[in-house]
Amino acid sequence: MTAVSQKTTTPSANFSLFRIAFAVFLTYMTVGLPLPVIPLFVHHELGYSNTMVGIAVGIQFFATVLTRGYAGRLADQYGAKRSALQGMLACGLAGAAWLLAALLPVSAPVKFALLIVGRLILGFGESQLLTGTLTWGLGLVGPTRSGKVMSWNGMAIYGALAAGAPLGLLIHSHFGFAALAGTTMVLPLLAWAFNGTVRKVPAYTGERPSLWSVVGLIWKPGLGLALQGVGFAVIGTFISLYFVSNGWTMAGFTLTAFGGAFVLMRILFGWMPDRFGGVKVAVVSLLVETAGLLLLWLAPTAWIALVGAALTGAGCSLIFPALGVEVVKRVPAQVRGTALGGYAAFQDISYGVTGPLAGMLATSYGYPSVFLAGAISAVVGILVTILSFRRG
């Protein structure tokens, strides 16, 4: 065993882990603040279709997928801290691209192109940020606390979504898209300053298997994660348009309900994957997610939709750490960054594919249909998880 694998959690390590997670919260506001606003900006201000809305939201995740391998190698070979800080700076640059889209006196296609550039930069930054912070956290507290590391980072991410969605709509409605873009440009720089003095963890040495051999070890939990991700993708992409189409207010608070329930589950039950193993926790979580998405599909009122969003958030909450525990068990220490990056890439692919496909579904069958599609995906995720791990 390496020295790192023998580490136990100390107060100083916990405080460093908190600082990393808080910096993730600040940086991930670059995702949370614009998430409910971009569909409105693309559809209402630029005049594009639901499919183009899906592309504008989903393309970020394709950029994340394509750079996960680079982020994992960067964290494994040159240090997780470098990966995380580099990701924060890239997320700040995304806000600069959106600021240009808001301020330049150019045509709608050019504004849309600048928006897409910002989304691509954000995807590049997100892959480095999350892969770096997960690997950094594991180096600080040790792999036996992998569920804790993933839970704290997840709380930061979805806390940023919960706080960012209504705040983003508020900033946009009162001050416009330029103010929103400027805010997203500044927050990652604050996160970078907050994390600058957290100690490095050494890069691992040893033989490094190829990326494809690592994927061969993690594809089963990755597939379960991808099927879970459809639910969040349809909420993040179409919930604001769903509410507007029904004449409901409080669209931003659906992501608050989702993110709040997500964080609460992590706080109360984030220890479960380390204690009981990932598979049982993942199956129960997918059942809860299914119930929430079915409520959103059938919701007669805004309040029922909010309950559905909260249930979906509660269901999604523990799936990443639950199946992530299985990933950490399967790979050697020197490729944990690559493995975690590849694992998260399954979710990114899900987010990226879901956006445009759900956009076509919404155009043909209405916005409720996308939530039914999410529920069906979660049910398939239950079956895949049970069958894969029973055979594995």
Curated annotation (Swiss-Prot):
It comes from the Bacteria. The keyword Transferase does not apply. The chain crosses the membrane at residues 22-42, 46-66, 97-117, 121-141, 151-171, 174-194, 224-244, 252-272, 276-298, 342-362, 369-389. Keywords: Cell inner membrane, Cell membrane, Membrane, Transmembrane, Transmembrane helix, Transport. One of its GO terms (molecular function) is transmembrane transporter activity. Coiled coil: none annotated. One of its GO terms (cellular component) is plasma membrane. It is a multi-pass membrane protein. It is found in: Cell inner membrane. Its main location: membrane. Pfam families: MFS_1 (PF07690). Belongs to the major facilitator superfamily. YfcJ family. PANTHER family: PTHR23517:SF1, RESISTANCE PROTEIN MDTM, PUTATIVE-RELATED-RELATED. HAMAP family: MFS_YfcJ (MF_02091). This is Uncharacterized MFS-type transporter YfcJ. The gene is yfcJ.
